[in-house]
Amino acid sequence: MVPKPDGSRRLCIDYRNLNDCTLDASWPMPNISAMLQRIGSQKPRIFGTMDLTQGYHQAPLTMQTRAFTSFIVFCGVYQFTRLPFGLKRAPSYFQEVMATFVLAGLIHITCEMYIDDCNVFGQNTEEFIARLKQIFERFRKCHIFLKASKCFFGYTEIDFVG
């Protein structure tokens, strides 16, 4: 268990051996400069940023993949049913799930997503709220939860991916 900045703890599994024989990610990670250019080209005036609660743990694993995440503790053998930290392809897989399933058709238009950070923007209040509603509806349907203390809405500028 590794302590997190907020005082809670994170279970960490050493997946180095698995990662050594895992193929490189097939889904590309977003280019931050390109994301910022896309946002800027829409000339937004209102911004919001959302942080997913334990982002990776909200992405389900296939039955085949679960076996590879097995780990042993004093009371038994367990495997993850959701994406754990430490896997070589975890960032890419999570990004793919968000882009092709959860927020399909919204990324690059309504919002930008980088791992578990979602940035929404609009030229005016009405557009911003309409976009937020679209994103919230997708998150609701897909059972994606946000960390309220890390969500900020209605700002004229925000920190994103940093």
What are these regions (language model features)?
Residues 1-162:
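Retroelement reverse transcriptase polymerase core
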